[in-house]
Amino acid sequence: MGILQDLEFRGLINQQTDAEGLEQLLEKESVKLYCGFDPTADSLHIGHMLPVLMLRRFQLAGHQPIALVGGGTGMIGDPSGKKAERTLNTKDTVAYYTESIKNQLSNFLEFENVDNPATMANNYDWLGNLDVISFLRDIGKNFGLNYMLAKDTVASRLETGISFTEFSYMILQSYDFLNLYQHHNCRLQIGGSDQWGNITAGLELIRKSEEDAKAYGLTIPLVTKSDGTKFGKTEGGAIWLDPEKTTPYEFYQFWINTDDRDVVKYLKYFTFLSHEEILELEKQVAEAPEKRAAQKALGAEMTKLVHGEEALEQAIKISAALFSGSVAELTASEIEQGFKDVPSVERTAEDTVLIDLLVESKISPSKRQAREDVTNGAIYVNGERTQALDYVVTEKDRIEGKFTIIRRGKKKYFLIRY
């Protein structure tokens, strides 16, 4: 099965130019393709996952991906999908973001020791020294104003306003494609569905600049959720690929909590499971949704892919401990991950009567309530129910000398930090 057939099965093709010509080219030779990533933060988030994994899919199929980091365009701002003007970052900030993103991309693509190595490019290398006269004479003259105004990315902003800076973004991205076509023989650009206007503008520039040019564009669908909320966002904000911003446990939980209506679609979009494995999981969703086999597979595949096997095992262990209440077996680093958003209080490492600890840490509102909670068996210290009114929290209750986990009732956790 060819790469395009696999993408069709997975629902990963939104629009493409000259489908027949592209299919013939991909069957005939190892093709260079690119996708651009503008450095707007110091980490990629899961909204970037689909295009990153598309590059990986093409590489696994024998083609040569170019990961283009927009050190130049990142200083301008892409108006695509934006209702208002972006805040421009400083040159130093963009350079820092660029380096961070380059490091992350290297986790997904093979840059050496393979027959079809991926390459990394930074468009600042050719845009940074581009002078205004050359830009207007050699590139700008190929773009009719009516043509640009008709593009969705621009048309959608005409009423609210768009600066000349962002208006020019399409021309710069088009020049990227031309540059990569001329200097790297890059024949295909891929991107999100909101990039269709920019991609086709690039193809038009190549057509006008190069005789008998054969270049192609392909977009992937916008990832949606059945409940109408935005994919990749939670109450806590974006889901980042950087483990310092989103812990592997939080990352795993994001996928595990996928709606039954979306899980098969996400297995197709994001994982490298075979068609047969996905169809089997689809069957399990229909026959035994309560077992959440598809969600577990999705969570495992994605966490392993982004954070590695060890981080996945930790995430599963934390999830199981929180579900069962057996938290004493967790290490300090696992507690740090799993209890990141739990109310916590700093205390000195000294022996304290449990009743006093509950009140002083504001777990119970009063001593009377604290005594009642303990007597009624509502208080757990590191997962163990504690009903003795004179119980003293000592060194043995401090996990690795750093934490004591208090639970009140079935699910209300509190973290004591030392």
From Swiss-Prot:
S4 RNA-binding domain: residues covered: 352-418
| Motif segment ('KMSKS' region) | 230-234
- Molecular functions (GO terms): ATP binding; RNA binding; tyrosine-tRNA ligase activity
Q: Where does ATP bind?
A: K233
Coiled coil where?
none
- Residues spanned by motif 'HIGH' region: 39-48
> Which residues make up the binding site for L-tyrosine?
Y34, Y169, Q173
Which residues are connected by disulfide bridges in this protein? none
Localization terms from the record? Cytoplasm
Keywords on record: Aminoacyl-tRNA synthetase, ATP-binding, Cytoplasm, Ligase, Nucleotide-binding, Protein biosynthesis, RNA-binding
Listed SMART domains: S4
Tell me which domain of life the UniProt entry assigns to the organism this sequence originates from. Bacteria
Record-linked CDD domains: S4, Tyr_Trp_RS_core
According to its UniProt record, this protein's enzyme class is: ligase
Q: Which family does it belong to?
A: Belongs to the class-I aminoacyl-tRNA synthetase family. TyrS type 1 subfamily.
* Function of the protein: Catalyzes the attachment of tyrosine to tRNA(Tyr) in a two-step reaction: tyrosine is first activated by ATP to form Tyr-AMP and then transferred to the acceptor end of tRNA(Tyr).
Name by which UniProt lists this protein: Tyrosine--tRNA ligase 1
Species for this entry: Bacillus cereus (strain ATCC 10987 / NRS 248)
